[in-house]
Amino acid sequence: MQRFLTFGVAAAWLVGCAAGVDRAEPVAIPFAPGACEVGVYQSADSFVTITRRGEGMRYTFNDGRTGNIGDGAQVECGEGVVQVDKSHIWQKRAMRVTNTEFESLGVRLAGQLIEPAEAGPNTPLVVLAHGSEELGWIEAVSYPYQFAGRGVSVFVYDKRGTGRSEGSYSQNFPQLADDLVAASFEAKRLAADRFGSFGLFGFSQGGWIVPLAAERAGADYIGIGYGLVVDILEEDASQVELELREAGYGDDVIAKAKEMTDVTARLAISGYSDGLEDLSALQTKYGDEDWFSLVRGGFSGIILGMSADDLGQNGIPMFDRLNIDWSIKPMDVLRDVNVPQLWVLAQNDREAPVSKTLEQLLALRGEGKDLKIFMFPDTDHGMWEYQQGSDGSRILTRVTDRYYDLLADWAGASLQPPYAMSEVK
């Protein structure tokens, strides 16, 4: 299935929105500060989304610039409008918003369908699977509004145990895939006769979940942002290696760390019964070396900081409640996905190191899978650009330019590279 056309849906949507704007004689709209309203606010050729941020609000421009609403912010809220740079008034765009509840595996989940006002039979519809954060996504993140602002209908829902949804928070991927399938059925029901193609997008941990759900959900395509094609154990080991290499350690220390992560993996999948003696031995062997205290990974750092007795008796409650299924093998899952896939990688991702994932994706393409792979340089997890200090710490600055365009264009079957500085792999 070819998903390249000549003009991106994101660009086409902005041109269409700008068509009725009289640039020669702009209408002056008085601005009075007021309470922020979640949604999309449009200028002639750009837009900004307003979402909730804890007790406050956050803005995100269509090019990825973002910040908190507050004193001195670039964006101020008014009734049905926002003021940008204290001089430009952008009006709220009309959207059809439908709140709903649906059931998955006996649990009530909260969802929201956001559609452009003129959504019709050719409008793409996507459902979003978010990452591991214990945060409901309804009205809280920019992604749904970035899609809707580009003419794509989008269904977002709060994962079980988060936001408005019931149930217990989980990182059991098959269970979360079942929830995604249920969300897909609900999205299609609500948008009946007002959508064309249907896709799933997963971000971070959602990149493990979307492929599990793709066939049952009836997806025409899938998109993954900063996900992994390694399992949870491999992710942990990759993170540990990256941490130590960034700290300046070489292959000798990496080999020692590999001994450690092999043992922590055995402990994790066995419920802390297989490897306790080996853990004690390695803690004694390497515990006084400088690199040992730097190990974090996904879970290895916590295990290494515990005694074997404590681990065997008490486990790790913060992990044990997650109901993790350690058996999922992403390559096996992806071999069963028979629709086009988009993978967008952050080159300098510390949470999801990309080297192995890229290698695996290229192997899948070699097996005949329809994959488009884009990598954005100088970005970290979440497609964030950053400033890095001399100590290696990073301050996240903005979502990289054209990332959101790429996602929406994929949904609209209208990819048109290049996307800023991204590399097509």
State each model region's role.
Residues 29, 83-119:
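N-terminal cap/lid segment of alpha/beta-hydrolase-fold proteins
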Residues 121-131:
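Short beta-strand element of the alpha/beta-hydrolase
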Residues 131-145, 159, 355:
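The serine-hydrolase catalytic nucleophile loop
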Residues 147-164:
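Conserved alpha/beta-hydrolase
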Residues 170-190:
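Alpha/beta-hydrolase active-site loop
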Residues 225-333:
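Accessory cap/linker subdomain of secreted extracellular hydrolases
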Residues 337, 343-345, 349:
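Short beta-strand/loop motif that positions the catalytic acidic residue
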Residues 350-356:
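Conserved alpha/beta-hydrolase "acid-adjacent" motif
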